[in-house]
């Protein structure tokens, strides 16, 4: 019987591995490696401590590129090929029309990227220079890998701001911003945000403002298409990304520290049968935005109908939908780690003074549902009665939470005796997925011969990490630098009891 159960485990394991490698929408990691509290960088918190569970605790698919040496860059995660160079700034219409005649490296099938394609190359190792008074851009760190892609800040000598490094996407907002402006989404790789920008001239005749932005063309198979399945248990799995989401949300606004604690409590409760939920990082959460939906056009949040979103009363007393926290800190040169990233699934509201200097403020959808901005992690929203920044971004601080987990990280157990992993068993190793090293945690309530072994996908024993007599809770580091990328099985044995978990090594 035990042999049969062991075979079943490997069948289930193989199926989960097949699912991992059939993902069509790989969400690369944000690149955030620093840890923060509400204001500044800190050492890495341990499980159970304040601020545990933020972005830097979890390593996803690491950004990986090949410079093809011909002016193009290939993303090894997404399969997309990118233009390496920085274009001249152009209007939205020019960005769309110029691609028809664009040829590079012998290819003529380039296109303007969608917002999800463009956001796939953002990095949150960047630092927002907003408010910085310097001029030497060599001191700045943008939100893109400049060892791979060419990048320029805004040209102050031409009257631009340093942060004017917006890039057009092809994604048009299904509603309008400001006072009825046709809008296209873009990514600002200088300050690390998604906003909707005017796609057409705005303003009175003869005084129109014409938005121009950089362009980085892309080619390759379609990227960023979700494949959601309602699991019928309060969760939704995206087969395309391999991520499982809770179907609902926190149903209450929380500051950032409270949001992390809320997720930790869900794990303590073994919510929906799982104890490895996390607050999503910025790229994971943006990955479930549905840019065909908005409060104005579909009377819904910008998310698919399998999900439910709390309805809030916005700053104008109207029904709207929340901002949702991510575990990603939005680092800033002036205030360090005070802000964290959120995704607006409702309208991205802002207070606009109209006309300027009139003292008359109007609340408008300034950036569009699906925008990515940031909020202070703590404080009192009333301290920002007319928002923050040039478009008066509303400050809420108490935002909502939707947790996520890796759909393929379910525990695998070999017998019915293993029902108390808090006494005997493996705890989720971290990071997972990992690059080179991962910390394996386990507990044992009595003395006895313990074996902690690592197997590859074929069932071959590759390493024995622990073999001895141990009691209590333990952590050991597995150095996998000598092994190839792939899925591995961690197996803890004590007498006739075993507990098995999967882990993914990515190099």
PLM region descriptions:
Residues 1-9:
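Bacterial N-terminal signal peptides that target proteins for export
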Residues 4-5, 268, 418-420:
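Short hydrophobic/aromatic segments of transmembrane alpha-helices and their interfaces
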Residues 9-18:
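Bacterial N-terminal signal peptides
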Residues 17-22, 144, 150, 187, ...:
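Compositionally biased non-globular segments, especially hydrophobic aliphatic-rich helices
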Residues 21-111, 115-277, 283-410:
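Glycine-aromatic-enriched surface loops/turns that form tight recognition elements
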Residues 410-416:
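Short, compositionally biased serine/threonine- and acidic-rich segments at solvent-exposed termini, linkers
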Residues 418-430, 434-507:
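C-terminal outer-membrane/trafficking sorting elements
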